[in-house]
UniProtKB/Swiss-Prot annotation:
Record InterPro entries: HemC, Porphobilin_deaminase_cofac_BS, Porphobilin_deaminase_N, Porphobilinogen_deaminase_C, Porphobilinogen_deaminase_C_sf
Names of required cofactors: dipyrromethane
HAMAP family: Porphobil_deam
Protein name (database record): Porphobilinogen deaminase
Pathway where this protein functions: Porphyrin-containing compound metabolism; protoporphyrin-IX biosynthesis; coproporphyrinogen-III from 5-aminolevulinate: step 2/4
Gene that this sequence comes from: hemC
């Protein structure tokens, strides 16, 4: 019996996502044996500093990629928003699964919405993208760092450390915690991270058998959207060091891409949007990136 070993982070959300991919693989290939290889990454272990300060979201991938290179795993499953814009050789993304809700969720035990927060309320997030949009919408708020997995962050809220926190809707709902969401933060006022809500499979792109095995899990509609978002981010040379947000949505046969570059320090933001054929998401992403740069985003990117 053929076996596929999936490298995964140990967090509850990462394990859920990897088991979801494993289930899809078993359904598509009856008789295939799929097992998880849980691993800890530096991004999971260092929680006293922001991701930007310790090297970025790529920290969540490196140990999993090394496991594949060592022959300890055949593939890895990631939240696509954590995957760098450029993959190292020989890696590829053969499958981007159907996207979950890409929105951010406003979570609070006391207040029903962002607007309902009192002046000076404490909001937890370590995401520069979320901080930038919070600064733009509510410059009076106290923004406090918040690291850890979903359950850890909720526990910190429940223990009174924050008046509200912002988390991805997809992560909460995948863990059965959707009832904690009191409001969705949605376009056009609020934009998510590029590829937020999407799960991707990474493997050796030169391994034709693995590439074919995962191809059936790929969702073309999701891939078109996230490729536009990632193309925009790539053209801006965006990373977790810079507040960049993007969301592509279907509009008939076309994609409508909205993008934002912000400042986490003072709430300044530059926005742009465009519609283009879904058959060429890369061009659409590059177009919106150019519009952002032409509107002054370069000044924020170089801060």
């Amino acid at each position: 019996m053929e076996t596929v070993r999936i490298a995964t982070r140990k967090s509850p959300l990462a394990l859920w996502q990897s088991e979801h991919v494993a289930d899809r693989l078993r359904q598509a290939h009856p008789g295939l044996h799929v097992e998880l290889v849980p691993m800890s990454t530096r991004g999971d272990e260092v929680l006293d500093r922001s991701l930007a300060a310790i090297g970025g979201k790529g920290l969540f991938l490196k140990e999993l990629e090394l496991a594949m290179l060592r022959g300890e795993a055949d593939c890895a499953v990631h939240s696509l928003k954590d995957v760098p814009m450029e993959l190292d050789e020989p890696f590829a993304l053969p499958a981007m699964l159907t996207r979950h809700d890409p929105a951010d969720g406003f979570v609070s035990n006391l207040y029903a919405s962002l607007d309902a927060l009192p002046i000076g309320a404490r909001v937890g997030t370590s995401s520069l993208r979320r901080q930038a949009q919070l600064r733009a919408l509510r410059p009076d708020l106290q923004l406090l760092d918040l690291r850890g997995n979903v359950n850890t962050r909720l526990a910190k809220l429940d223990n009174g450390g924050y008046d509200a926190i912002v988390l991805a809707v997809a992560g909460l709902e995948r863990l059965g915690l959707g009832e904690r969401i009191v409001a969705r933060l949605q376009p056009p006022q609020w934009l998510p991270a590029p590829a937020q809500g999407a799960v991707a499979v990474e493997c050796d792109g030169s391994n034709a058998r693995l590439m074919a095995l995962f191809a059936g899990l790929d969702d073309a509609a999701t891939r078109a959207c996230v490729e536009a978002e990632r193309a925009m981010n790539r053209a801006l040379h965006g990373s977790c060091h810079v507040p960049v947000a993007a969301i592509a949505q279907w509009q008939g046969q076309d994609l409508h891409l909205q993008g934002l570059v912000g400042s986490a320090s003072d709430g300044r933001a530059v926005r742009a949007e465009a519609v283009g054929p879904a058959s060429d998401p890369e061009v659409l992403g590059q177009r919106v990136a150019k519009m952002l740069l032409d509107a002054g985003a370069g000044e924020l990117l170089n801060v």
